[in-house]
């Protein structure tokens, strides 16, 4: 699960598989109100990597998602007398499309975000999902990012995401998800839900509770009540993009109290 890396203003947010250290014992039952507030804070504003500054403002999507899905396989070509492995784009597998459609529908329902067809709007996709063989996960062709960072993110061999956001306004501009196509389908299904959820502005993991998409111990393929509270809190109209942490957490308490009372 995610490791998060921050850069200033041209702001790149990156995450790959790897757990957030526990602050305390795992909670088996439902979280209390105060624990839900703390959980939201840990997912949105804390940092998983030592010496890396956590996010200081609320970051989320304010524009429609234009989703594109690509799948690649390795091909061997000969160049200058040498054999080289390259990526070749192929048809996306039906199970992968099914997983993405299911998760996208769940996320759109929870956040009220809009989607657009980039072919109809003429605008480039801003939410790209790539399926590649494991050893190609760090291929610089997949994302315009530091090759060393891509290699680091790919080293876990599961999946990772990168998000570009404005460090001041908090508006997310684009996201790229890279998935190891050689994994078992059940792992890919979980991985897609995790990365798609976190690419919406919820970058961190927490093992505070096992029954959560944000837990390193989880292999869930649907969102729990706690997950929905966290996601809905971020995308509640009262949670303005760009709010600094202190203000955001004051607003979060109000929203979480309402959601905790309303959700079954």
Sequence positions of predicted segments:
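Metalloprotease/metallohydrolase-associated module, dominated by Zn2+-dependent proteases
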Residues: 27-43, 49-52, 145-187, 203-264
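Bacterial N-terminal signal peptides
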Residues: 8-16
């Amino acid at each position: 699960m995610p490791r998060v890396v921050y850069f200033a203003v041209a702001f790149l947010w990156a995450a790959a598989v790897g757990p957030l250290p526990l602050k305390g014992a795992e909670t088996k039952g439902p979280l209390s109100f105060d624990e839900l507030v703390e959980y939201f804070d840990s997912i949105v504003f804390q940092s998983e990597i030592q010496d890396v500054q956590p996010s200081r403002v609320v970051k989320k999507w304010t524009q429609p998602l234009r989703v594109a899905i690509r799948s690649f396989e390795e091909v061997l070509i000969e160049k200058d007398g040498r054999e080289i492995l390259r990526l070749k784009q192929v048809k996306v597998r039906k199970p992968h499309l099914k997983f993405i459609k299911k998760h996208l529908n769940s996320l759109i329902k929870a956040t009220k975000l809009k989607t657009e067809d980039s072919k109809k709007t003429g605008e480039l996709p801003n939410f790209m999902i790539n399926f590649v063989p494991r050893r190609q996960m760090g291929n610089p062709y997949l994302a315009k990012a530091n090759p060393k960072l891509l290699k680091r993110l790919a080293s876990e061999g599961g999946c990772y995401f990168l998000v570009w956001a404005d460090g001041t306004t908090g508006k997310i501009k684009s996201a790229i998800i890279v998935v190891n196509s050689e994994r078992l389908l059940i792992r890919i299904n979980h991985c897609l839900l995790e990365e798609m959820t976190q690419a919406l502005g919820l970058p961190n993991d927490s093992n505070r509770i096992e029954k959560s998409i944000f837990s390193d111990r989880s292999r869930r393929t649907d969102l729990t009540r706690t997950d929905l509270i966290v996601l809905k809190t971020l995308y509640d109209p009262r949670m303005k993009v760009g709010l600094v942490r202190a203000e955001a957490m004051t607003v979060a308490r109000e929203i979480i109290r309402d959601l905790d009372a309303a959700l079954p």
